[in-house]
From Swiss-Prot:
This is Ion-translocating oxidoreductase complex subunit A. GO terms for cellular component: plasma membrane. It is an enzyme of class 7 (translocase). Belongs to the NqrDE/RnfAE family. Its EC number is 7.-.-.-. It is a multi-pass membrane protein. InterPro entries: Ion_transpt_RnfA/RsxA (IPR011293), NqrDE/RnfAE (IPR003667), NqrDE/RnfAE_oxidrdctase (IPR050133). It is found in: Cell inner membrane.
Length: 192
């Protein structure tokens, strides 16, 4: 039980996919200008990342390995992710049309979010079992969501601040992301 908790904390804080592994930067920069969109994207990505992580593990364990098809791993994981994202998009469209409009193109782009594929591949490379895969996927999603929401809140405050002209827009956003990454480096000694 302790190792599962350490895996979760390690994935959320110590090895954050956005700030440490630099995965998922496209939605991190693209959706973070408004807090409401960031929260919606966080919920959708959490659902997709967790479900895709589990389904990718099952695909690898019961389809690819028994038939020696490991060379199709990346392509099959992309297919699994695309199906999960399509299901999520239909679910969001039915439950919240306003959120679907707010997320716009970024919802289908979860398919190409390198963090989702990265989690699926790292689960296999790190030889996680089913429970560890689910925890790793959920932890990566929580870490992504936490960083996205924090960054979005900071960007909203920066939009109202008196930022010098050369630093407005993307420049101050990159500086802020770098400072967040430095802050998360403080968690490096948390788990050994």
């Amino acid at each position: 039980m302790t190792e599962y908790l350490l895996l979760l904390i390690g994935t959320v804080l110590v090895n954050n996919f956005v700030l440490v592994k630099f995965l998922g930067l496209c939605p991190f920069m693209g959706v973070s200008s408004k807090l409401a969109s960031a929260i919606g994207m966080s919920m959708a990505t959490t659902f997709v990342l967790t479900l895709a992580s589990v389904l990718s593990f099952l695909t690898n364990e019961f389809l690819l390995q028994p038939f020696s098809l490991e060379y199709l791993r990346t392509m099959s994981f992309i297919l699994v992710i695309a199906v999960v994202v399509q299901f999520t998009e239909m679910l969001v469209q039915k439950t919240s049309a306003s959120l679907h409009r707010a997320l716009g193109i970024y919802l289908p782009l979860i398919t190409t979010n390198c963090a989702v594929l990265g989690v699926a591949l790292l689960n296999i490379n790190e030889d996680h079992n089913f429970i560890e895969s689910a925890i790793y996927g959920f932890g990566a999603a929580v870490g992504f969501s936490m960083v996205l929401i924090l960054f979005s809140a900071m960007r909203e405050r920066l939009a109202a601040a008196d930022v010098p002209l050369p630093f407005r827009g993307g420049a101050i956003a990159m500086i802020t992301a770098g400072l967040m990454s430095l802050a998360f480096m403080g968690f490096a000694g948390l788990i050994k």
